[in-house]
Amino acid sequence: NVDPVVNVDPVVNVDPVVNVDPNKNYDNKVAIILTCTVNRQSKIVEHIPQGQSDEKERVETYIKSIKKWLYETSLPIVVVENSGYEFPELEFEKDMFKERFEMVLYNETTLQEAAYLKDNHSKGTHEVFSIYYAKRQSKLIIQSACNFIIKVTGRFYIPEFENYLKKHDLSNIKALRQNRALNCQIVGCHIDQFNFIFNKRCFYRDEYAEYENDYIEILYKDKIDSLPNENVLKCPVFNIEPTTGGCGGTVTYL
């Protein structure tokens, strides 16, 4: 049986691009954080039972995407995996791309700093911690002098993304979001905004109590909406190779 295509709703119109010189490329100092979870926790499976759960399939999906980011772009890539999987399949790439490839690996269930997530069933909240942890542990982000960090869900590769970023001056951009405000496979920000956009405590902070039973997508949206519009880069819709989504189905664009 073929998985249903999950994103068949009408594509949101993209805002017209202004002041983009097609002949100019910007040297933005961007780092991509690819978030991965090979072994899903039972509490997450119970909360999202339709998600891809087979470990082998999840590994294959991640490996395919990670290799494309490495072989088909020149971007600094930080892979973060939060279930203890070490990606032995990438030993060759770790050496070949050592100047711009790094893995931050940990097991959330045994990491004391993540103990507050023990009873949390929100997949997004666990991911926010992994983004925070990856940035804190990363040596590559510091060594590459990256000042703009973009989280991309690890299973997805976006062929157009690097060229898109080159056409935009990110020096005055505080946050980057997908074309659909309530999607969060792609979320980025200037490093000065990192602790605001990707705060590890997320729903647990008093000022976000109203979001306690909501999705991380809503929190991201409201945070980015609070920033000046001229300082937010809204991405176009990116076509991607059909990829199994984390919540099931097949994703064909982001």
Residue ranges and their predicted role:
Residues 23-254:
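ER/Golgi luminal nucleotide-sugar-dependent glycosyltransferases, focusing on the catalytic module
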